[in-house]
Amino acid sequence: MNARRRKHWGWGFEDEQPSPEEVRAAAGGLATHLGFPPVEVEDPVSLEAVRLPAPRVVAPAELAGICAADVHVRASHALGKSYSDVVLGFRGHFEHPPDFVASPRDERDVERLLEWCAAERVAAIPYGGGTSVVGGVQPVVDSNYNGAISIDLAGLRQVVEVDEVSRAARIQGGATGPDLEAQLAEHGLTLRHFPQSFELSTLGGWIATRAAGHFATVWTHIEDFVESVRAIAPTGAWESRRLPGSGAGPSPDRLLVGSEGTLGVITEAWVRVQPRPTHRASVGVRFPTFAIGAECVRALSQSGLHPSNCRLIDPAEARFTMSGDGTFALLVLGFESCDHPVGLSMDRALAICAEHGGLAGGRRESSEGRDRSRGGVGAGGGGTGVGGPKKGDAPPARAGTTETSDAGGGIGAWREAFLRAPYVRDIFVAMGVLSETFETAITWDRFPGFHERVIAAARAAAEDTSGAAHVSCRFTHVYPDGPAPYYTVLAPAQRGEEVEQWAAIKAAVSEVIVAEGATITHHHAVGRDHRPWYDRQRPDPFAAALRGAKAAVDPQAVMNPGVLVDPLS
């Protein structure tokens, strides 16, 4: 386990929690900014006041040394990090904690744990960073199981081997973003996969959930970096061959990527790495409307330029994040390379933006440590320099990396808001604001009508349950055939009814997303929360094949039951 203790609810560590006074000050400012009525800020239920159900099973003697069942460890592994999870944890409601938490030191420990779980009919929940926002790590099981445990991979966090010739690294599944980046930096390399959860999430978790990261185009998901995967299932270990590419039948890698802990515990993977970029160019571009900006982004995505950053923020989100005054959409545009200057690519991209009525400002270029900045964009959001991440263009400063970006102006403000989002969400819960996000992908030809209907459904559902709503959208990733829009819904919460409000909004918007032919998730995964809509999205024969694969590697159905497929009775 980590030396620093995680909060038993919400995001982050115990030693970085804001004081009650700081929470109240932040809450007052947020309520005013959103235009929501002020409410009394509540304090979370302390760990000392938490009461958990008694464990149903205890660790066997031969594994007792790597297992713990104290209140903190059970509570902190009972929930993920969705809005509903944070609300439940905030109020001290941990109805389904794991019976104990196991922290394997090596693969043999994982094997022994799964052997015991299969023999005793105990559910095994792989746990990386616990950052799931879709109900992916809850140890919720029915009476067909004698209990449930969490298997915390924090003890498997090393970069084991680096192949500098092939530019690949063998990394254990429990390595967090900061863990692996710090170790790769010793070799002058980087994975450059920076999801918003980078600080706490793990390589194994990224692979299990098909996480998306730094690059807005081309290499959008973790699977684009996966060379091979190794997992331990109840029936034994399985590992794919290291290959740059293969046409030999269905891919074993792709079966494990996105398996969400149902087919085994991902203990390590070979991933493609690269030198840190030495050439960058970035700029902010304003558009009078989100629709006009979307047309420009479509042109950029189909141009063959492949910008590393191409994220469009609508006026509502720009205003909320203080990167704009609400009168324009903002495009965060950037290029990077470890080999050559990227100014010419930026020149052509800006020409495309100009053809669509975009107004650029705050262009910045750097090559091998030499920065060159030009111009700025003034009113309603200041100058623009490019910031980082959406599902991570640059990791949080606390992550221990050395890369920086221009934090001034509109895009800098948006970047900082992005990095603070998980912490702000905890404050939302304390101040009585409901917060939910919907991320999806759809083809360009259907996007305009789809966007209108999703916005309308989100606003109607939030206003129906809360009386007011703040709904915004941004593109997290873009493809030649369509965007990946990401919708945020904020609304006043009714104390004591937050989870019911959240569920009503979740269902209303998810229904529209699936009915319109979009995906229920682009990068948050399925978990338990998205199961009803995922079941409708996937073909029935594929569902049957997936059940067959699970039966082959997990015949007792102990691996994360209820996720992706129904548990066996």
Predicted region positions:
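Glycine-rich N-terminal segment of FAD-binding domains in flavoprotein oxidoreductases
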Residues: 55-63, 68-154, 191
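A glycine- and small-aliphatic-rich helix-loop capping segment at beta-alpha/alpha-beta transitions
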Residues: 84-85, 136-155, 185-189, 212-220, ...
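Non-catalytic terminal accessory/regulatory regions of metabolic enzymes
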Residues: 1-78
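Activity-critical C-terminal alpha-helical subdomain
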Residues: 530-569
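C-terminal substrate-recognition/cap domain of FAD-linked oxidoreductases
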Residues: 44, 55-61, 65-89, 271, ...
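FAD-binding subdomain of flavoenzyme oxidoreductases
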Residues: 157-311, 385-391, 396-398, 558
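Alpha-helix capping/hinge segments and adjacent helical runs
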Residues: 514-525, 549-551, 555-559
